[in-house]
Amino acid sequence: MHEMALCEGIIGIVEEEARKRAFAKVNVVCLEIGALSHVAPEALQFCFEAVAARTIAQGAKLEIVETPGTAWCMACSKSVEIKQRYEPCPSCGGYQLQVTGGEEMRVRELEVD
């Protein structure tokens, strides 16, 4: 379960921001997760509670905003939305797709006291 390691990284980012900006408590952590990132949101929610315990983020709500996968189709020269890798272009049916978005995971916003 790599979600545990991802949550440890998220808490590391939150704690670093707390040191830089001198806030005492995190109420909400908002993440942006791409549809092609291979991250299971349910598992991330579960792991976040465990990793956040006894940190500045203890009790914080984890909000997840899922972003779509996008790709450039070399066959029809269109930017298209895809749900998973290796599926055909929804516009022309071709398989010459280059992923352009949806692989990322980032801390989008923190609500703090």
Curated annotation (Swiss-Prot):
Key word Calcium present: no
Keyword set, alphabetical order: Metal-binding, Nickel, Zinc
UniProt-listed NCBIfam families: hypA
Pfam families: HypA
Residue ranges that the Swiss-Prot or TrEMBL entry lists as coiled coil: none
Entry similarity comment: Belongs to the HypA/HybF family.
Residues reported in the UniProt entry to bind Ni(2+): 2
InterPro entries in the record: Hydgase_Ni_incorp_HypA/HybF_CS, HypA/HybF
Biological-process GO terms, alphabetical: protein maturation; protein modification process
Functional note: Involved in the maturation of [NiFe] hydrogenases. Required for nickel insertion into the metal center of the hydrogenase.
PROSITE patterns per UniProt: HYPA
Chain sites annotated for binding Zn(2+): 73, 76, 89, 92
Molecular function as annotated in GO: nickel cation binding; zinc ion binding
Stated name of the protein: Hydrogenase maturation factor HypA 2
